[in-house]
Amino acid sequence: MGEVQREKVAVIIGPTAVGKTKLSIDLAKALNGEIISGDSMQIYRTMDIGTAKVTKAEMDGIPHYMIDIKNPEDSFSVAEFQERVRKHIREITERGKLPIIVGGTGLYIQSVLFDYQFTDDAGDVIYREQMEKLALERGVEYVHKKLQEVDPESAERIHANNVRRVIRALEIFHMTGEKMSDQIEKQEKELLYDVSLIGLTMDREMLYDRINLRVDLMMEQGLLEEVEGLYNRGIRDCQSIQAIGYKEIYDYFENRASLEDAVSQLKTNSRRYAKRQLTWFRNKMDVTWFDVTDGEKTSEILRYIEGKLQVKSNNSK
């Protein structure tokens, strides 16, 4: 029997503010593609400005998926993301189109492309509740330290403030005796799709300037009012509010920071996030990088995808 033909997928990754949105739409037009957002926060409705969500005008008629599918108070997991995106890939391919995943949330994108398996069981609820209680009583750093003791690699990757994921890693070790980082390493070996993995990068100072300008533009567009709307709805300890762009402005509404300091912190956190994104992609994924410091590389990237996936663009007919 011949080898089963794998579905073709183009993936565009890179740090925040590097120019992924425009490139993805240009490529979708040229390659008869449809776009799947690979951003873990653009799934939330009414959180448009702070997540730099693509607008209807920017979409220019290109179908987009995994945007506005949850309310801000809803939780969302990597496992659900994986399941939904794989379904979209299948359906887009069946329509004779090319799925194009665009985004910056490394683990989410990786979970789709590789053989990541998430347990369906509820886990150890009693153990999880014990850890949640410890986090409340003794602080998140205490629970993070427990993870460092049993799984230092996961502790390095998961920030102490991401309590849910810290506890999940502890729970996996408690239940299986196996480190979450070891499980992930096993699952990172084989791609499930025929993938063209494109990364955009640019001069760091230029990128940081773009990030600072983007934050200023967000404030002009009404980020303060957007966050105030969420705050007034009583949305507090939700996964969505941990997003950069929201937690900083929440500090202002809760009188923990002046507006000037909150905006400054937002810029700092965005720059740090961009740096972490680049580190993740370089360490974890086999990316072909294109430096866009001196301008767009759309034609060059298009030619690369055509060769890698053996597809034809509208331009090459």
From Swiss-Prot:
GO terms for molecular function: ATP binding; tRNA dimethylallyltransferase activity. ATP binds at G14, P15, T16, A17, V18, G19, K20, T21. Its EC number is 2.5.1.75. Keywords: ATP-binding, Magnesium, Nucleotide-binding, Transferase, tRNA processing. It catalyses: adenosine(37) in tRNA + dimethylallyl diphosphate = N(6)-dimethylallyladenosine(37) in tRNA + diphosphate. Residues 39-42 are annotated as: Interaction with substrate tRNA. InterPro entries: Dimethylallyltransferase, IPT, P-loop_NTPase. The record marks T105, R128 as: Interaction with substrate tRNA. Substrate binds at T16, A17, V18, G19, K20, T21. The keyword Phosphoprotein does not apply. It comes from the Bacteria. GO terms for biological process: tRNA modification. The keyword Glycoprotein does not apply. Its cofactor is Mg(2+). Monomer. Belongs to the IPP transferase family. Catalyzes the transfer of a dimethylallyl group onto the adenine at position 37 in tRNAs that read codons beginning with uridine, leading to the formation of N6-(dimethylallyl)adenosine (i(6)A). This is tRNA dimethylallyltransferase. It comes from Bacillus cereus (strain B4264). The lineage of its organism: Bacteria, Bacillati, Bacillota, Bacilli, Bacillales.
